[in-house]
Curated annotation (Swiss-Prot):
GO MF annotations, alphabetized: ATP binding; phosphoribosylaminoimidazolesuccinocarboxamide synthase activity
The protein's name: Phosphoribosylaminoimidazole-succinocarboxamide synthase
NCBIfam families: PRK13961.1 (NF010568), purC (TIGR00081)
Lineage of the organism: Bacteria, Pseudomonadati, Pseudomonadota, Gammaproteobacteria, Lysobacterales
Gene Ontology CC annotations of this record: cytoplasm
């Protein structure tokens, strides 16, 4: 049975960051089942909050955080031969404070290594859609990469491309940047490592998803480094919130294909007289239910996990 959580409440765990969807807590040393310095590990909780147009909406999607967490964990495990990840294997229940309903957190939280974020969004695109399509229409390029003339919306690219963006604060918009700008921001060596890892993961995941009847149009990854400079993939991985997944049997070049994400919500919001600033409008129950069904189907098709 899926739980619903809009805001984490974990007395005794210092809140480090409250994002659009995830709450991040430091884990005091006394709560760790391993001998380590305080602050080396974090508890990341995927709530059921939903954001659209960079605004967190007032209505949760019940169980969404649990679904996202399970999809991420599936992909972290499936790709660990390609790139180490932030997971530690420490049991979530062992670090949660006493006196709370731990069932709210067991399936939606993970204990992770504490890493230094690289500071950019690492995006791989295999198809021309979204902001990439808009950039191409305007300039013929995406993130400074020249593409062939005459491509259509949602068309498969000759080869997947790395198209990083800035990592904006909550309420602000990420901006696409070219590779030279990425080098200036994080350094040439780290930029190349992130680019290579992003494309390596995308190639692997796109092949696997296709075997499940799903096209992986693009995905956004986040990376961090430890004190020794080792690179890890972190945060979330290949979820419907960070990726565009399209059903193969509904894919058609020249249109924006249906996807396993919050597109239903975005489409609904576009019909409203709303200026896309906070506070966001409430959602009809039908939109909430149909959006949840999309996330549930993605989990089932990709990971083979049934939750209903």
């Amino acid at each position: 049975m899926l739980t619903t959580l809009l805001q984490s409440d974990l007395p005794g765990l210092p809140l480090r960051h409250c994002g659009k969807v995830r709450d991040v807590f430091d884990i005091p040393r006394k709560r760790l089942p391993v001998d380590t310095r305080s602050g080396e590990y974090l508890l990341i909780v995927a709530t059921d909050r939903l954001s659209a147009f960079d605004v967190v909406l007032p209505d949760p999607i019940p169980g969404k955080g649990e679904i996202l967490c399970q999809i991420s964990n599936f992909w972290f495990q499936k790709t660990e031969h390609l790139m180490p990840n932030h997971l530690t294997g420490i049991n979530v229940a062992s670090v949660l404070p006493d006196g709370i309903d731990k069932t709210l957190y067991i399936q939606r939280a993970v204990v992770t290594k504490k890493l230094k974020p690289v500071g950019i969004e690492a995006i791989a695109r295999g198809y021309l859609i979204g902001s990439g399509w808009k950039d191409y229409q305007r300039t013929g390029k995406v993130s400074g990469i020249q593409l062939p003339d005459g491509l259509q919306e949602a068309e498969k690219l000759p080869d997947p491309i790395f198209t990083p963006s800035t990592k904006a604060a909550v309420g602000h918009h990420d901006e696409n940047i070219d590779f030279d700008t990425t080098v200036k921001m994080v350094g040439a060596e780290l930029a190349e490592r992130v680019r290579d890892a992003t494309l390596r993961i995308y190639h692997f995941a796109a092949k696997y998803a296709a075997e499940c009847g799903i096209l992986l149009a693009d995905t956004k990854l986040e990376f961090g480094t430890d004190i020794d400079g080792r690179l890890y993939v972190m945060d979330e991985m290949l979820t419907p919130d960070s990726s565009r997944y399209w059903p193969i049997d509904e894919y058609q070049v020249g249109t924006s294909p249906p996807s396993y994400d919050k597109q239903l919500v975005r489409n609904y919001l576009e019909t409203l007289d709303w200026d896309k600033t906070a506070p966001g409008p409430t959602l009809p129950q039908d939109i909430i239910d149909r959006t949840r069904a999309k996330y549930t189907e993605a989990l089932q098709r990709l990971a083979g996990i049934n939750i209903d």
